[in-house]
Each structure stands twice: as structure tokens, then as C-alpha cells.
Amino acid sequence: MSGILTRWRQLGRRYFWPHLLLGMVAASFGLPALSNAAETNTPARTTASTASKVNFSHLALLEASNRRPNFTVDYWHQHAIRTVIRHLSFAMAPQTLPVADAPSPLQAHHIALLNTLSAMLTQEGTPPAIVRRLSLAYFAPQTAFSIPAWISQAQGIRAGPQRLS
């Protein structure tokens, strides 16, 4: 019985908690950081009225502005990022000392990952550049349903010309 508990504790320490923490860090970057309590107490009818006035021509800009109003990282984000950096530092440490060997691409990737995470803690976040002009793709409406056209659109298969004109 104690062997099972020991294995379960080792599994949690090695795999579960670091992956859960990494998932929390990754998911938290997409969520807005609430700076004051006034934002949380907005009535539901104002949200519904603003949703009805949305201009749908710039959906990408709306998604970015709604998802990231502030670019601050609060204390718990910093704590989670530091813990992930600590876990990655120990996990990516070389087991043996190389003898004047060139660094492998995997080691360079690990170093770049750690540098990126530490830069997220030390550098001030900047909002992404706003794209002023969006080019929309033109889709010609089809007059009648045809199975070959549907297959080519759904599966990406083109078996011949769509129109014989």
C-alpha cells in the first residue's frame, strides 16, 4: 500500500503539478487582469446593449481589445511564471558536462524558452500593433448546390472545373 502511495506522490510531483502550473500560466495570458472592482460590478443590461452596437467589420480588433484590456501581470501570474522557470531550469539542466561540444538545437530551444519566460517577468508588456486596414476575401455565392463543389470546399479537393464557361 505504501508503494502505491509513493508512486502516486512521485507522479504528482514530476508530472501533474508542473503541467497544471504550465497550463495555468499559458491560459492566464489570454484573460484580462481586473484592475478595480468597478469593472466587475457592471450591470448585465449595459453588456447586452454594447453587444448589440458592435461593428462586425473588425472582429479581430474587437477580440484583441476585449481579451486584453491591460497588459499587467499580477502577483500570482509572476509567481506561476517563476515556478515554471524553476521547474524548467531543473528539467533542462544537462546531466553530464559536455567536453567542448557544440550546443544542440534542443539546448538552444530550452535556453530561448527560459529567456522568453524571464523576459516576460522583467519587461513591461506592450500592446500589439493595431491593424488599420483589413482585407476581406471575396467569396462568390454559388447559385445551386452541387456535390462536387461541396466536397471541394469541405475537403479541399478539386476534381475539375467548377464552371464550364
Curated annotation (Swiss-Prot):
The entry's function note states:
Regulates secA expression by translational coupling of the secM secA operon. Translational pausing at a specific Pro residue 5 residues before the end of the protein may allow disruption of a mRNA repressor helix that normally suppresses secA translation initiation.
Q: Which superkingdom?
A: Bacteria
Q: Where found in the cell?
A: Cytoplasm, Cytosol; Periplasm
Q: Name one GO molecular function term.
A: translation regulator activity
> One cellular component GO annotation, for this chain's record?
periplasmic space
Protein family membership: Belongs to the SecM family.
Q: Does the keyword Ligase apply?
A: no
Q: What is this protein called?
A: Secretion monitor
Alphabetical list of InterPro entries matching this protein: SecM
* Organism whose genome encodes this protein: Salmonella paratyphi B (strain ATCC BAA-1250 / SPB7)
User: Keywords on this record?
Assistant: Cytoplasm, Periplasm, Signal
Pfam families, A to Z: SecM
Instruction: Extract the signal peptide range.
Output: 1-37
